[in-house]
Amino acid sequence: VLIKLTLGNSGSNIIGKDEKISIAHDYIGQLNISGTISETETDSVLSSSTYHHRWLLDRIADMKDDKRNKGLMLIVNTPGGSVYASDELYLAIKDYQKKTRRPVYSYMATQATSGGYYISAPCDRIMINRNCWTGSIGVTMGTMYNIKDFLNKMGVKTVTITSGRNKAMGNMTDDMTGEQKKILQSLVDEAYDQFVG
């Protein structure tokens, strides 16, 4: 008898967020990966999507050590998020596969872009809802604002004290140098190369 155990990303479906799994039969663990992938827990006020990074990593580790677990099913519904958190989840999935030799499947529901695509990449099989948005492979550092001129017009003077010439890189009150732009671009390029490599 094989039973599917549904584990909500907050753990509220079956077990409390901090409780361990206790199942009497063989099962396939289902992890719902919903919301923006980040290192911290996120709850969205405007939607029901919640993402609990540590909880997901702990459940993968628990199932890796559980002989009754016979595989993982990821239900992916995320726009992606942090490069670090996406990579940490990707590596946890790869480690689960390597140590257990059990199958891992991904079902891309309505959205699996960027980090959602990345965490699905190592899966043995990927299934996609025909209406799912997926892809959007890339890395962004986001928009960096410079409010120096605005503050000057308002009569506000700023002073930045640092211990290194690039320590204040990205500071909203200082102009970015060509060297700083190259440094930031190299960080984005490195993350992208890891993503597609």
Regions found by a protein language model. Name each.
Residues 1-102, 111-197:
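Small-residue-centered hinge/linker elements
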